[in-house]
């Protein structure tokens, strides 16, 4: 299912023409199967288009457009996981790589507010400048810090689910 020109134009109006594409070569790069699954296919279904929003306002506008036009959407940051793949046709990809800012580091209460594409290495470097540390999961320092924190409480050394002495 190819996007209608007016729908594609609406996505361009939100993120700019340089931050949306339906080029088959680029869509195929997003369709490489990223996880271990029982199927032998090397590719998942293609997204209808890929968008690269820069902030929450653009994310909200993309979601509104998807809802208006009966499209599904799938957002991902660094993309390490099969949950980033489309389940079928009619899906718009929100690649959040432009959302890579550390908004706040609260040293007193030991938390950070980050955008989705902030990777552990970036966060750790800023924390170390302040004498702080974070738990970098087994996924590695090139993975986004946000999804794992939201999904699994940031690992075994997190403040709220700790087995470690550092939180006393």
List each language-model region with its residue ranges.
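Extended, alpha-helix-rich binding/interface surfaces that flank or overlap catalytic cores
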Residues: 117
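A gly/ser-rich beta-alpha-beta helix-loop segment of oxidoreductase catalytic cores
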Residues: 114, 127-168
């Amino acid at each position: 299912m190819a996007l209608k020109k007016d729908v594609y134009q609406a996505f361009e109006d939100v993120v700019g023409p340089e931050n949306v594409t339906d080029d088959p070569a680029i869509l195929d790069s997003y369709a490489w199967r990223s996880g271990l699954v029982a199927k032998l296919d090397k590719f998942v279904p293609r997204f209808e288009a890929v968008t690269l929003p820069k902030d929450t306002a653009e994310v909200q506008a993309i979601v509104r457009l998807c809802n208006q036009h009966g499209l599904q959407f799938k957002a991902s940051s660094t993309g390490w996981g099969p949950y980033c793949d489309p389940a079928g046709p009619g899906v718009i990809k929100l690649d959040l790589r432009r959302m890579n800012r550390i908004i706040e580091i609260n040293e007193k209460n030991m938390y950070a507010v980050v955008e989705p594409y902030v990777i552990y290495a970036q966060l750790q470097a800023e924390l170390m400048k302040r004498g702080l540390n974070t738990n970098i999961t087994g996924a590695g320092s090139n993975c986004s810090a946000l999804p794992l924190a939201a999904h699994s409480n940031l690992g075994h050394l997190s403040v709220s689910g700790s087995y470690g002495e550092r939180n006393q």
